[in-house]
Amino acid sequence: MPGFWYHKNLRSPKSAPSFHTSDSWQVREDRLSTPLTGIYDEKSGTYYTVLRTDTPDCEALACHNYGDVILSGKTSLGFTGFRNADAHAALVFGFPYCEAPRSYVRKLTLAPAVRAFEKLEKGETRRLTWTLRKGVSPSYSSFVADVWNYSFDALDPQPVKPRYTPAEAKAILAEYFAQSYVGDYPLKYTSGVELRTADCESTGIAEIGFVGRVLLNAYNALEYGEANGREDLAANARSIFDSYLRYGFTPGGLLREVVDFKRERETDVYSIRRQSEGVYALLNYLAYEKQQGRSHPEWEARIRTLLEKFLSLQNPDGSFPRKFRDNLTVVDASGGSTPSATLPLTMAYTYFKNEAYRRSARRTADYLEKNLISKADYFSSTLDANCEDKEASLYAATAMYYMTFVSEGTERQRYIDLCREAAYFALSWYYLWDVPFAQGQMLGDAGFRSRGWGNVSVENNHVDVFIFEFATVLDFLAETCDEPRFSRTSAVIKSSMLQLMPVEGSMFEIGRTGYYPEVVQHTAWDYGKNGKGFYNDIFAPGWTVASLWQMLSPDRVTTFFAN
């Protein structure tokens, strides 16, 4: 079930939808990035799918979210899933929606089953269409690719009418850089973590990588400020980099990942993901500065020291532990975050001309091929969860894309092939259709179209704008592999993800211009507040702004490696 269920969801806990809880599941269609269920037989390679092929266009509010509920009006949402039928896997589908054996209403919170009823007047008819299909694929990955291609052709998503040009979008997002700057503490930063949507007041949290992305946003602000006469942005960005050079490292030479000045606490467990995202931002910054004729030998020395820590942390199989302490003692050995390290390692090889970094990057690629891509098992790329998630396959595809810049010949072609395989899996998380909303639900009233937005993970059933370089990766694959569906999907994503831009006249319940929303709740689920059709009340615009900025800078990666 795309964007919701892969294999048996065995990496997800019992408190989320998984085989641990039941061997039969059916869910409402708007939980799925494609309203489809597919069953694949690994022994024979045979698969069956059922796809909703008419257009769901209306939704009705229900007085309860469990048990038998009579809807207040017309809905177009059905359900789909699979069932254990006498030890055989069976496809199920129907109308209106019915979720069993449990519904999923909040992170790690299963609720009782729900069955909806809609009134059908005497003599009234409703016509709904599902298409059954049989196919054969040699592997689970090729099955996912085949089904995605088929679904894309059947649903034919088109770009959303653009509201802003890339330049206009950046001008709006740049207001986040200006308003979120905090200069009251030794570390200067843009405040983008644990903000309230209602007022967007800055918090005391400085976070270098996910979810704050302080260093990447500082680079974005510097580049934009100098190019557009915004000296205020450039000056703030320089102060951020200067403060991190002076105060931003641990005694062991790692980047200080999360510092909460108001609560007077700081993490003492570090992650390969945040460290990698910090180095990634710093190398972009240094390359930009070098192009401007400015050198930073002290920064370069700091980064070299940090990269030596990377080389020490890497396991013999090429993976990196997910979490560790300042003395590099491993806290979480999971290798799911390994692709985040591939990016800065390839960049460091190019910037410093040190072959050790490329060797390390190659070893990460070997690990990803053997343990994630070949097994179609993308997991635990986030900071804490172990479940199946979008970011793992997206990061794997992006890692292989970066490897193509430091390789040639058959080696480069291998990375292209792996990038393509992982990209299909990542694409399966992105919506190919527009879910319907009921009147009074903000997203529906605002005309929101879900096509092009990505489901987050098995544990988190909302959509977001996590994209970064992935649209650029899709355009690269479209040209390199002669696959126009990739570039068409990229166009859908790039147009759709700018829909909810908070700007005067259409703030969409966000307190400040440019603070892009994070938790967009498009189905019967919420992160803590408000439910379908609304945002959660707490959000992290630090990463959403950084993600969209990267999407709006398609030449950034090629420019880095070319220079």
How would you name each of these model-derived features?
Residues 313, 366-378, 382, 407-537, ...:
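Non-catalytic carbohydrate-binding regions of carbohydrate-active enzymes
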Residues 120, 138-207, 238-239, 243-258, ...:
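Low-complexity, Ser/Thr/Pro/Gly-enriched N-terminal "stalk/linker" regions
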Residues 185-207, 253-274, 319-340, 377-399, ...:
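Carbohydrate-binding/catalytic loop surfaces
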Residues 163-178, 218, 231-245, 276-279, ...:
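Hydrophobic core segments within long, regular secondary-structure runs in both alpha-
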